[in-house]
Amino acid sequence: MISLIAALAVDRVIGMENAMPWNLPADLAWFKRNTLNKPVIMGRHTWESIGRPLPGRKNIILSSQPGTDDRVTWVKSVDEAIAACGDVPEIMVIGGGRVYEQFLPKAQKLYLTHIDAEVEGDTHFPDYEPDDWESVFSEFHDADAQNSHSYCFEILERR
């Protein structure tokens, strides 16, 4: 099963200049909980913004210009990325925008964090048809001392 995991502000903004323009430790914990011990696929820009392999996960970098870091697996196509994951129950696609666009048609599940923030962004989550998805989990949280904005975790499964 292919799943996408993303944090989205208003207007589906997911990033600005290779960074997330908010401070939500709870979302980072949600991300870790849902990706640990699963292969993660990301684009080169996302890889560069993280700066290191995510521990406890097979890191697969999709790029037309593969790098030389041998701590991760470099691939040039969506099919190659899927094959590099091996026989696993769930593959997690973690961004960025172009990689989400490439995998959305193949995805069966979306793990979304909806952030109540209007922020400037240069990267967006692809538009998706809500009628194609069923919400199977939703959990709202107010902003607090650690988390700069209110947010809602949601899991959607393709109908």
Swiss-Prot record:
NADP(+) binds at residues 7, 13-19, 45-46, 63-64, 76, 95-102. Substrate binds at residues 5, 27, 52, 57, 113. PROSITE patterns: DHFR_1, DHFR_2. The keyword NADP applies. Gene3D superfamilies: Dihydrofolate Reductase, subunit A. Keywords: Antibiotic resistance, Methotrexate resistance, NADP, One-carbon metabolism, Oxidoreductase, Trimethoprim resistance. GO terms for molecular function: dihydrofolate reductase activity; dihydrofolic acid binding; folic acid binding; methotrexate binding; NADP binding; NADP+ binding; NADPH binding. InterPro entries: DHFR (IPR012259), DHFR-like_dom_sf (IPR024072), DHFR_CS (IPR017925), DHFR_dom (IPR001796). Changing residue 154 to Q: In strain: 1810. One of its GO terms (cellular component) is cytosol. It comes from the Bacteria. The keyword tRNA processing does not apply. Changing residue 16 to F/S: Increases catalytic rate about 2-fold. GO terms for biological process: 10-formyltetrahydrofolate biosynthetic process; dihydrofolate metabolic process; folic acid biosynthetic process; folic acid metabolic process; one-carbon metabolic process; response to antibiotic; response to methotrexate; response to xenobiotic stimulus. Pathway: Cofactor biosynthesis; tetrahydrofolate biosynthesis; 5,6,7,8-tetrahydrofolate from 7,8-dihydrofolate: step 1/1. Residues 1-158 form the DHFR domain. It catalyses: (6S)-5,6,7,8-tetrahydrofolate + NADP(+) = 7,8-dihydrofolate + NADPH + H(+). Its EC number is 1.5.1.3. Key enzyme in folate metabolism. Catalyzes an essential reaction for de novo glycine and purine synthesis, and for DNA precursor synthesis. The strain K12 sequence is shown. Strain B [RT500] is resistant to 500 micrograms per milliliter of trimethoprim. Belongs to the dihydrofolate reductase family. NCBIfam families: PRK10769.1 (NF008037). This is Dihydrofolate reductase. It comes from Escherichia coli (strain K12).
